[in-house]
């Protein structure tokens, strides 16, 4: 959520920055609501002051032996007017907040302006795509050859966009997640966490999934039953529970940065993806991901983004997978991000790069929703922290990349050296 003071005092500047994202801010409506808020605020404060004054007069009149009934009636009437004014103000403030919750984050100044993914800017490349001297098989064909990917069984159990993994393919999937966790915890300084896969609505509001993206989630009960404490949603990413661990907390600055990682399944309805990537593991309703989250001082967040992106890159480099790094343009960034790098891995069967990691600096956008603050040791003042999140990596898509990039002419799949300790030193699948 954006700073309310910024929306009040600099709406035109905010609107200009949001326009870079393709978001039209209704400045006139915001101004009208703000003017109304000021009037109601003053009216409420005046009624409160008048009621307090009259209440004090009752005691004074009583001490003088005067009839207090007229004053008592007046105080009661003022109380009713005050309650009505407060209710009207609360309704207006709720309307302003609901609007604020639908406004995306401001893009950082260095983010390239653009409309969609076609305007993203490539930053660098690592590795050279392998040249094959045989017909390339895609991961679905390879998975079926080794009885490792069973989409038909998943359709029987659940439906489309699910998979049953078996045998050595399932083992490699597990090995990838273990390798990623070990790398991030042992070399990159993250603490491993196990988190709930179901979260409440406060948690989803904290990281920005609600109210705007309710349709992308799997809910245990209809969304309108929000007040019920047992109404949960499956997590779309471990970013949600990990980041919310600091909700309503004040953290001493010398405890920052906080670096957390978790391996979880992720659940997404893919509501806007009908007809896209219908074959294979690229776009699933349920997929595994190793997530990285950092909680940092505001002045450290841009450097932390570079560091976190480097941590995701290291996974790909150690696996020997060619990839490219791009900076997302304003029109392609996620709702809460102020700056995002995507890593795209080479997928031979598609002859293209596909997203495998997204690393974002969210600035204080989530922290304001969560009221997550840090305290300076010198002056004891508090301020909002900055939060960052990144995929390190999406496990299923990494499996796709390994299977296709390491395939052999006879259909066997070479196991990357860094994964062999997790697979009893197995060199080939098949």
UniProtKB/Swiss-Prot annotation:
It is found in: Cytoplasm. InterPro entries: aa-tRNA-synt_IIb, aa-tRNA-synth_II, aa-tRNA-synth_II/BPL/LPL, Ser-tRNA-ligase_type_1, Ser-tRNA-synth_1_N, SerRS_1_N_sf, SerRS_core, tRNA-bd_arm. GO terms for biological process: selenocysteine biosynthetic process; seryl-tRNA aminoacylation. Gene3D superfamilies: Bira Bifunctional Protein, Domain 2, Serine-tRNA synthetase, tRNA binding domain. It holds the Pfam family tRNA-synt_2b. It catalyses: tRNA(Ser) + L-serine + ATP = L-seryl-tRNA(Ser) + AMP + diphosphate + H(+); tRNA(Sec) + L-serine + ATP = L-seryl-tRNA(Sec) + AMP + diphosphate + H(+). Keywords: Aminoacyl-tRNA synthetase, ATP-binding, Cytoplasm, Ligase, Nucleotide-binding, Protein biosynthesis. ATP binds at residues 268-270, 355-358. Pathway: Aminoacyl-tRNA biosynthesis; selenocysteinyl-tRNA(Sec) biosynthesis; L-seryl-tRNA(Sec) from L-serine and tRNA(Sec): step 1/1. GO terms for cellular component: cytoplasm. Its main location: cytoplasm. It is an enzyme of class 6 (ligase). Coiled coil: none annotated. Catalyzes the attachment of serine to tRNA(Ser). Is also able to aminoacylate tRNA(Sec) with serine, to form the misacylated tRNA L-seryl-tRNA(Sec), which will be further converted into selenocysteinyl-tRNA(Sec). Belongs to the class-II aminoacyl-tRNA synthetase family. Type-1 seryl-tRNA synthetase subfamily. Consists of two distinct domains, a catalytic core and a N-terminal extension that is involved in tRNA binding. This is Serine--tRNA ligase. It comes from Salmonella schwarzengrund (strain CVM19633).
